[in-house]
């Protein structure tokens, strides 16, 4: 209460992101958040309302947008030099073992993590698809728990077909 930093960088377990961000925004302190911004749609709406009322700025860390190769691809797409984008494929091949979830005290739970591979491991790849291709117009997805059924309650596998205004992408 006595200090007023220029910015707060929130890099805590997911379930703490929104309460900490709202606390800071209500005090007009700029907020920079790690992913995910929220663990539910309702939380995201609360965060948006707090940001709209605040004089402070709210930002999210999607750092892969600034990789040189991604910037070059974005420039080629936006300039038309790459031609028309017809489709895309994105694969997240990493796999987390049981210890990643069980030793954290909060991962693997809908209440505290908010989801699994969708909002944790693959979120940066999803962001790059949107950054390069625009906002999705339709999404057809299946999520399941193939590998850690008796360990976590969130999904560990996601398959999606995403349409970006006529550009079709497969995501796994």
Annotate the PLM regions.
Residues 10, 36, 62, 117-118:
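Glycine- and other small-residue-rich loops at beta-strand/loop junctions that grip anionic moieties
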Residues 1-50:
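Beta-loop-alpha module in the N-terminal Rossmann-like domain of NAD(P)-dependent dehydrogenases
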Residues 64-151:
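Predominantly a Rossmann-like dinucleotide-binding segment in NAD(P)-dependent oxidoreductases
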Residues 33, 58-60, 171:
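Hydrophobic residues in well-ordered beta-strands that form the structural core
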Residues 155, 160-166:
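Active-site beta-strand termini and strand-to-loop segments that position acidic
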Residues 46-63, 83-90:
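Rossmann-fold dehydrogenase core element
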Residues 27-29, 54-57, 166-168:
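A short helix->loop->beta-strand "cap" motif at the edges of active sites that frequently abuts
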């Amino acid at each position: 209460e006595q200090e007023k930093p220029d910015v707060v960088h929130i890099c805590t377990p997911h379930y703490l992101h929104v309460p900490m961000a709202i606390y800071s925004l209500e005090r007009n302190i700029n907020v920079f958040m790690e992913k995910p911004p929220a663990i539910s749609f309702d939380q995201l709406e609360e965060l948006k309302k707090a940001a709209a009322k605040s004089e402070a700025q709210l930002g999210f860390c999607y750092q892969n947008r600034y990789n040189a190769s991604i910037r070059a691809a974005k420039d080629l797409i936006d300039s038309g030099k790459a031609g028309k984008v017809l489709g895309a494929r994105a694969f997240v091949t990493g796999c987390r073992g049981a210890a990643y979830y069980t030793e954290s005290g909060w991962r693997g739970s809908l209440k505290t993590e908010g989801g699994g591979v969708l909002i944790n491991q693959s979120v940066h790849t999803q962001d790059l698809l949107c950054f390069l291709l625009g906002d999705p117009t339709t999404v057809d997805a299946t999520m399941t728990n193939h590998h850690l059924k008796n360990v976590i309650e969130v999904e560990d596998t996601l398959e999606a077909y995403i349409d970006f205004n006529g550009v079709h992408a497969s995501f796994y």
